[in-house]
Amino acid sequence: MIPQSALDRLRRAPWLIRPETQQVFALLDGAGGRTRAVGGIVRDTLVDRTRETAEIDFATELKPDEVSKRAAVAGVPVYPTGIEHGTVTLKVGDLVAEVTTLREDVETDGRHAKVKFGKDWTRDAERRDFTLNALYARADGTLFDPLGGADDCIAGYVRFIGDADQRIAEDRLRVYRFFRFTASHGHEKFDPSGLEAVTRAAGSLDGLSAERVGSEMRRMLDLPRVGTTLGAMRRAGVLEFPMPLVDWLGKYERHAHRPNLNARLALLVESLGSAGLRERWRLSNDDIGSAERTLTAARLLIGFHINEAAYRFPAVLVDAIDVAAAIAGWTEAGKSAVVGHLEGIEVPRFPVSGNDLIEKGFSPGPGLGAELDRLEKKWIASKFRLDKAALLADLKR
């Protein structure tokens, strides 16, 4: 039974009543009821997990060319972002509205689907992955729930629509999505039939692109609690993580103040290496770089080079403490001792600047930068004891 409070929350949701959203409905709802908001925004509103968003998904009976024509007449920018799948994107003020024509799959290969357009809302719902994602809202906030997804959503139950094996055969990425949504919306409690289906499919995932898998894993690793889920993925044969990594991830999650993507990636880099992780999931240079810095800081903390860690990596120091604790197996007392030491130090300041070297005859450029870097490393190696005079006396021209 859907609580009345959840339905009321949907009707008065800020994202729904904002002028830009209502403008999209007015633009596309010529005969009334022809367009509905769909998916995550509706799902998360029902369980009071909405956040400020600049993007909303819509489903419509209108074909893409008609959506584009109506947008053009209204002076609304429109972009054919996924036209082969019936999707165009409208830009209404600061709202990005992804509008997709009602569809049903006519051919799938486990990665992509060929679709045909239609006007049957239930058929459109049936082609989606999980019941909690097949939820729609009209312009007035009235819920349309053809498959009982709202009850599953409220209960935190991630259930495949129809036959789980068939849903996975249509798009094998749904194996990863099953685990991610169970971690984010299912409280890490698995639907038994769904878990059996993804286990059966574990041997057929090699054809998935690293980018698509990486996107799912990145989102999963940024969730507060994923330890149970990662363990289930390993047992199902979906993830091939070595046991030390599984152990580190478990310790990290149990003791970290705010578990997050960056720290978990640092643990993965320690176990799998940067190159292996980059190849496996095609993660961005920013993600890998931040994880590497965090891991380097953690290694310094493990070696009790605490001042150096604080000086070189202040931006990732909090994550580095938790990563070091997981890798080294620190007790809470040991972790508290490191934190106490950090709180009691004053982060040193490198006493030499580029201007100092210019005054000594250096010209601006790579040579100056290299010499400044050499002096800084020498200063760090001295445990920050060398002063400005001693460093300048060591200049190499």
Set out the residue ranges of the language-model regions.
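Catalytic cores of the polymerase beta-like nucleotidyltransferase superfamily
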Residues: M1-R397
